[in-house]
């Protein structure tokens, strides 16, 4: 087995590693269908071989060509390392600077088989969220990071390490762009071709920015979403006996089972992939499993009657589950579900993100490769059936929301009945969770802040949990607005229960929805704890791209922006640049993420705290911008909560000066001017 020293020594060429092919017993990505011409196939092969010297090209060319033919992409399976892939303690990485070792720690966590969805295809989550495009890129990146100094920056072009370039000590050590395609060519069809050629890739959000922390990363947001959905739709705080039905137990969607237990409801989650379902069950994220609809309904009724807390995984298609719930309603008059959503990977519906109810899992995988056009028709028919069932249940006291996975967008494209009469382009019959729930949370500056303890020691994580709890309790004691206090209280509950619910999968990480003040205060507290050796090693700060400022996405993060700018990406791009100039250790900008390729621009960062005063200064400056940018934009769009928060922030910081909007008080002024 390789060592970390060997892993950082560059591409293994003399001798070449044994070609072991695809590993049995681990999940693999669906076959891609890029429809390359003979000339384009030659180009894809030529592009792959340029990583290797001429003396090995003749040997590698046939196997790379076979991968392209069989799987629609050249992953270079021969170069999949035989080391145990996981986030090793930072001290074990060979490096010239500890920040580079921290980045290597994060990269290997994204590829840990316990974390990654399709580890051999370098996919972390979402069906196609790549860390790299091929294994040669992984080896080169690890080599560059091990050699990098504080006066160099590693530049990443869609998985490809362009090289180390001279820069200043204050510059980012790593700058990542993923999928930056000219807008006119940012279509799904073009993507399949460009990815097969090896010239671009879909990094999802935290997959391609090396900041994924396992399904915990979305558990907290799901907890907040379900809690606030119950408050808004059901008018309750206690979810005992309430039923939440949804789909997906993958890298992100797997969080739904754990979130259901944390909020105290009955979560029924459908999943077509048995491997994904069993993985969550083994990890303790899913309490029970069944492949019988009869048993599923029976168990749901029992738990509902006894007000049990339950996460039940149904191995089957969610459309069958929705239609069975309609059957129960029509035959017994009883609506067995209170809340519902969907977390299939609908951003990628025709290549494994959504499986049609008419086919088994294996039949669907075969058809999507052999006849993509027929497969697409079946997917769209299945979407129409799913929406029809949801619409019937919604006639009762049942509430559904879109989880920002492009479900309603794809349903609309399929011809399903999701239209909201008189609505704008970003509105449907059912709201997105941003429009009704998370949007106001973002507008107050709260979002999925996170940190990773690079020592790999659970005790370090426990210390950070204590520090974060103290920060939030002190903030409440100092006095905050009622709406902000509610968020803080939810977060204190989360942090106290996090360890009990065994949320860590992979690196020793924690997510916490926090606002600007909270993020800065937590960062300062952690940095001081590192300085006094209470925490043993550096801590990486980051966040999901799905945040206050990180993402422009008209069907998710910015779907509650109604001034017409929901389709504009200035905020996300400015955030990427602004983080880079204010002290981020690394920054990333992506096309796609969440809703899908061509639908989103998003970015993220990593910031390494090492206990120095300089690290504290960078954290204060960068985290303040990273939140205020989005609050200011949301304020300008007309959001009242954002207006109040940015005004308060300006009062607290005299160097912050934001342009504030003036409301049109009398709508008749517009009508008269336009002669309407």
From Swiss-Prot:
InterPro entries: Urocanase, Urocanase-like, Urocanase_C, Urocanase_central_sf, Urocanase_CS, Urocanase_N, Urocanase_Rossmann-like, Urocanase_sf
Main enzyme class: lyase
Gene3D superfamilies: Urocanase like domains (3.40.50.10730), Urocanase superfamily (3.40.1770.10)
Coiled-coil region: none
Pathway annotation from the record: Amino-acid degradation; L-histidine degradation into L-glutamate; N-formimidoyl-L-glutamate from L-histidine: step 2/3
EC number: 4.2.1.49
Necessary cofactors: NAD(+)
GO cellular component, one term: cytosol
Top-level division of the source organism's lineage: Eukaryota
Entry GO MF terms: urocanate hydratase activity
Binding site for NAD(+): 126-127, 204, 251-253, 271, 317-318, 343-347, 354-355, 403, 594
Catalyzed reactions per annotation: 4-imidazolone-5-propanoate = trans-urocanate + H2O
Matching NCBIfam families: PRK05414.1
Family under the similarity heading: Belongs to the urocanase family.
Listed name of the protein: Urocanate hydratase
Organism: Homo sapiens
